[in-house]
Amino acid sequence: MSTEHVDHKTIARFAEDKVNLPKVKADDFREQAKRLQNKLEGYLSDHPDFSLKRMIPSGSLAKGTALRSLNDIDVAVYISGSDAPQDLRGLLDYLADRLRKAFPNFSPDQVKPQTYSVTVSFRGSGLDVDIVPVLYSGLPDWRGHLISQEDGSFLETSIPLHLDFIKARKRAAPKHFAQVVRLAKYWARLMKQERPNFRFKSFMIELILAKLLDNGVDFSNYPEALQAFFSYLVSTELRERIVFEDNYPASKIGTLSDLVQIIDPVNPVNNVARLYTQSNVDAIIDAAMDAGDAIDAAFYAPTKQLTVTYWQKVFGSSFQG
């Protein structure tokens, strides 16, 4: 096995040039999200009984796993009060109305309810902030209920605990855990473009890689870490239950009949992969097998040109070695 032609540094350079959200852009996005937070906090200080209690950045930007293709920010808003609607449409309209009150300088068309969130648009930058409502009743750790984008059900969650979960893995593998997550997400994004039946949630990718890290996989060599990821998908066929005990004992998880079982590290009754079918699994395994075979072939390719050709099967034509 050789990484003479494409090695860890080559993949790291590709990630910096093509995969990662540039730091300047990430800082700008965070600054705009912070402005919204500050506006809400200022409004709350003058209106302490206001139903919107806290705004917390969530999603890939907050986790540090955002791709270069990111063009909006995910933010959770905690809503308290008995008058908050319990149905999706009503809740989003309610949230939009409250946001317009908290941000009076925004015109009505800059605050628009969407399918599962309310989008706040910044005119100057063209940036959109997707604000997701979380119903909050005062539970510790900011545990509340958000609406599942898969089936519209209410799920208990804690944005701070989710962020702490990722931070713990980033501490265990500084720089490298987040980078391997971004590389795997980039691959999955490419597969979605190339393969019509392919679906693979970013949250599932994060949790699978977190489990591999917890199990001792070395993330400091990107070709080998990616190969470990693809090998895991193929060897387990996603039939291995993935559980974390950061916030609850594994014994809290009951018997499940779901095909794929990747349990939310904050909520033991939420299987984040519960809707994945055998067809979905087959598509992931087929793509992972092709990627793993390509990396294997790249390790033994006699020339740089051939090595790059194999890596392009993983990362597409933008990979030039």
UniProtKB/Swiss-Prot annotation:
One of its GO terms (biological process) is defense response to virus. CDD domains: NT_2-5OAS_ClassI-CCAase. Changing residue 30 to A: Prevents formation of second messenger, decreased DNA-binding. It comes from the Bacteria. Changing residue 54 to A: Prevents formation of second messenger. PANTHER family: 2-5 OLIGOADENYLATE SYNTHETASE (PTHR11258), C2H2-TYPE DOMAIN-CONTAINING PROTEIN (PTHR11258:SF11). In the disassembly complex (PDB:6P8V) Cap6 (also called Trip13) crystallizes as a right-handed spiral; the top 4 subunits bind ATP while the bottom 2 do not. A CdnC monomer lies along the surface of the hexamer at the interface of subunits 5 and 6, with Cap7 (also called HORMA) at its tip, over the central hexamer pore. The N-terminus of Cap7 extends into the pore, contacting 5/6 Cap6 subunits. This is Cyclic AMP-AMP-AMP synthase. It comes from Escherichia coli (strain MS 115-1).
